[in-house]
Design a protein with these regions (language model features):
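Conserved beta-strand segments of alpha/beta enzyme cores
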Residues: 96, 121-123, 171, 192-195
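Class I SAM-dependent transferase core
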Residues: 1-70, 75, 105-108, 112-122
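Conserved beta-strand signature within the Rossmann-like core of class I S-adenosyl-L-methionine
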Residues: 163-179
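Conserved SAM/SAH cofactor-binding pocket of Class I
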Residues: 60-142, 152
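A generic alpha-to-beta junction signature in SAM-dependent methyltransferases
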Residues: 66, 159, 163-166
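Active-site capping/gating segments
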Residues: 177-215
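A short, conserved alpha-helix within the catalytic core of class I
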Residues: 148-158
Length: 215
């Protein structure tokens, strides 16, 4: 636990005011992922030692801009190993997160992490985003899952219209990297965009972006 707590410094450098429970959850997160990644590879072997920077802190870039409020419902589509959903669920304990993925073995790891961290605000579902029916959420979050055009097509039916944040309408929030010029052009959308490197001063976040499309 002491080693994991030391690695948390890359998070606490940018985010403060965590409760003891949140600190313990973030620390335990590293231990559980490392153990399960030996059995089911949900995180690149070369990235597991950089888990807190490349996966946890990257996920929390969303929290640097969007201050979700208590009672909101967020869906993480194509959650993979649980990112960005699990770090955000720790960060926002009074917000409900629904994590979905089409690959069952990845959700097995997600469920083990959720149980180990005792995250009461997380549910999971083995399903493709486009197959979800009769459920709506305040925001959709996603990380490196699909082209923006597809993400938006999947997200639109999942977004309710009742606005719960003053600063932002309900919408899609996604983490992307690289040159997005062609992808954005092909989507015919005009997303709001933030350079993550302007928010988090770590070299890993060069050419990493946070995109937002309001419903």
């Amino acid at each position: 636990m002491e080693e994991a707590t030391g690695k948390l410094e890359v998070i606490t450098r940018y985010f403060a005011d965590f409760s003891n429970q949140q600190i313990n959850q973030f620390a335990e997160l590293g231990r559980v992922y490392t153990a399960w990644n030996e059995k089911i590879n949900v995180i690149s072997r070369r990235d597991i030692d950089s888990l807190y920077e490349k996966h946890v802190l990257h996920s929390l870039a969303i929290a640097a801009i969007f201050k979700f409020s208590a009672g909101m419902n967020i869906i993480d589509i194509g959650t993979g190993g649980g990112f960005p959903g699990i770090p955000l669920a720790i960060f926002f304990p009074e917000v409900r997160f629904h994590l979905v993925d089409s690959i069952g073995k990845k959700l097995k790891v997600v469920n083990e992490v959720v149980n180990a961290l005792q995250l009461k605000n997380v549910t999971t579902q083995h399903i493709r985003a486009e197959e979800i029916r009769n459920r709506q959420f305040d925001f959709v979050v996603s990380r490196a899952v699909a082209p923006l055009k597809d993400l938006w097509q999947w997200s639109k039916p999942l977004l309710n219209k009742e606005r719960k944040m003053e600063a932002f309408k309900n919408g899609l929030i996604c983490l992307k990297g690289g040159d997005l010029t062609q992808e954005i052009q092909e989507s015919r959308l005009k997303p709001h965009s933030w350079e993550i490197s302007a928010l988090i001063k770590e070299s890993f976040f060069s050419e990493k972006y946070l995109l937002y499309i309001p419903a």
